[in-house]
C-alpha cells in the first residue's frame, strides 16, 4: 500500500463550551498510511506540554488511518493567547494547521 500524507483540520472550541469555562481544540488527522503519526501542539509558537491527548490511529474503510488530537484549556487560557497550531509529523514530513483566536470570535 502506497504512503499517504495526512489531511489535517483544526477546529476551535465552541462558544457553548467556552460558556462552561472550558476550551477544547480538536485536530483531526485523516487518510494517512502507514498508521503512525506524532502530534505536537503550539500556543503562540511555544510547544505545549500538558492538556493534550491524541487518540490511537484507527483504520478507515479505505485502509488508510485516522486519528484525533485534543488540546484542553480553560476559557481564560484560550482568551490569553492568540495563535494555536497543531503539527502532525508523518513519515518525516510535518503538516501544520494554525488558527488565530481573533478569527473565531
Curated annotation (Swiss-Prot):
GO biological process, one term: immunoglobulin mediated immune response
Keyword Disulfide bond part of the UniProt annotation: yes
Top-level taxon: Eukaryota
Protein name: Ig lambda-1 chain C region
Membrane-crossing residue ranges in chain numbering: none
Coiled coil: none
Other facts noted in the record for this chain: The MOPC-315 cell line produces 2 light chains, 1 normal lambda-2 chain and 1 abnormal lambda-1 chain that is missing a large part of the V region. The C region sequence (shown here) appears completely normal.
Stretches assigned to the Ig-like domain: 6-100
UniProt KW keywords: Disulfide bond, Immunoglobulin domain
InterPro entries: Ig-like_dom (IPR007110), Ig-like_dom_sf (IPR036179), Ig-like_fold (IPR013783), Ig/MHC_CS (IPR003006), Ig_C1-set (IPR003597), MHC/Immunoglobulin (IPR050160)
Cellular component per GO, a single term: IgG immunoglobulin complex
Cysteines paired by S-S bonds: 27-86
UniProt GO MF annotations: antigen binding
Source organism phylogeny: Eukaryota, Metazoa, Chordata, Craniata, Vertebrata
Amino acid at each position: 500500500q502506497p504512503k499517504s500524507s495526512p489531511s489535517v483540520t483544526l477546529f476551535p472550541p465552541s462558544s457553548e463550551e467556552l460558556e462552561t469555562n472550558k476550551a477544547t481544540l480538536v485536530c483531526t488527522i485523516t487518510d494517512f498510511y502507514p498508521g503512525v503519526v506524532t502530534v505536537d501542539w503550539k500556543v503562540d509558537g511555544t510547544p505545549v506540554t500538558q492538556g493534550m491527548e491524541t487518540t490511537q490511529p484507527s483504520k478507515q474503510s479505505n485502509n488508510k488511518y485516522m486519528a484525533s488530537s485534543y488540546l484542553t484549556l480553560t476559557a481564560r487560557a484560550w482568551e490569553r493567547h492568540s495563535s494555536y497550531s497543531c503539527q502532525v509529523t508523518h513519515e518525516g514530513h510535518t503538516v501544520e494547521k494554525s488558527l488565530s483566536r481573533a478569527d473565531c470570535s
